[in-house]
Amino acid sequence: MTKIEIKKIVEDLIDTFLEAGKISLELRSKGLKKEIKSDNTPVSNGDLEVNKIITNKIKKITPKIPIISEETPDNKSDNDLKNFWLIDPIDGTYDYINNLEEFTINAGLIIDRKPVAGLIYAPAKKRMF
């Protein structure tokens, strides 16, 4: 994968991250449904909805690259992947569910076991990295 191809992929994801951030804030303003996962950490319907938005877009633009996501437990079985996406749809769920600003939406692209690109969006602060 060339640098130009990687740049295009990241550019294609920016609007999706902005949309996911908007939806995360809308869901939070309406009141989140919260649960505790088997690892004793919180998860909300916001986490799951953002995960769905991000993974659906990534599957469309890079269908041959597997996705490993915190909120999709059945996709962590292959420990020998060279190329994959690593996603944390809401990093900082505790802050997210408690109406604090310190949470982000994250995705990183790993090629040949090396990080080559990533996006981090802080919706409450409207900051993209």
Located regions from the model:
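DPxDG-like acidic metal-binding loop motif
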Residues: N79-F129
